[in-house]
Each structure stands twice: as structure tokens, then as C-alpha cells.
Amino acid sequence: MRIFDDIRAGLDRDPATKTGFELFWTSPGLHAIWVYRIAHLLWKARRRILSRILSNYAKFFSGIEIHPGAKIGRRFVIDHGTGVVIGETAEIGDDVLIYHGVTLGGKTLDPIKRHPTVGNRVIIGAGAKLIGNITIGDDCAVGANAVVTKNMPAGTVAVGVNARLINSISEDHYLI
């Protein structure tokens, strides 16, 4: 069940959280993800107004805005989530970790795919902005405050404004 996957992932990726009980009661990121999962089911069932109301509830209580039309995979973790914004056509793979202030935003008002697609096992650092219909490959890392407007091949690291790609991820890269 995805709810238990989300708890396990949160425990695995947040060394400050010691128990599932603690995570359950104190993680705004986890709460926002759970409300998103319910709102997304309602969105797919064409209960759009109710899904948007639930999303606004989560935003009010967590400071995290996830559009119910976004598609998010398993074991998704938002750590220190205040200010996170995930747009309507964003797609996020499995085992993704994002930090506070991250935006997965669009750059057009046209009713098309306008938000990023994020692969599996991606880490997105605090304050990073991923803008437009771009693809972030599997096993990538986006550094804190990077602005990414172009596709990232699998296994790369993006840093800076406008982000530049550096060869590949290694153990000694500290991005966040």
C-alpha cells in the first residue's frame, strides 16, 4: 500500500525522524502526500472541485502545494516541505526526494503538458526550480537553488542559475 511505502521511505531518508509514529504525527510532507493521493484519485474520477478543495486544505496546513492532476510515484518524500509547488502536468517517478522551496512549474498557460517529468531515484535540493516541459532522467541530482530549464540525461547533476550539467553523480557530491 502506498501509504506504508511513504512512511518507510520517510524513515529511510530522514535521519532526524526516529519512528513511524513520529513521522505519522509530525511530518507535513507526509501529510501533504497522503492528501494528494486521495485528491488525485478524486481528480481521476472527475471530482475536480472536491479534489481541488482537498489540495487547498493540504496547502493551508502544510505549506506544500501539489496539484491533484500531477502524477507521483511510490516512496515519494518531501523533507522540510514548506514552499514546495508541484504543477498540474508534473510527473514524478519512484523514490524521489525533494526539499523545501522546490518548484516544478510550467512556462506556458496553454492547456498542454507544461510541467517537468522527473525520473526515478532523483534528489532535488532546497529552492531548486524546474521549469517547463522538461525531462529529468533517472538517478539525477539537482543542486540547491538551481534553475533547470533543459532536459537532464540520466545520472547527471545540475547546479547553478541557469543550471549547468556536471558529468555524473559520485559519492563526494554534496548538493543539499
Task: Kindly give the residue locations of the regions a language model identified.
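Terminal amphipathic alpha-helical/low-complexity segments used for targeting or macromolecular assembly
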Residues: 1-62, 173-176
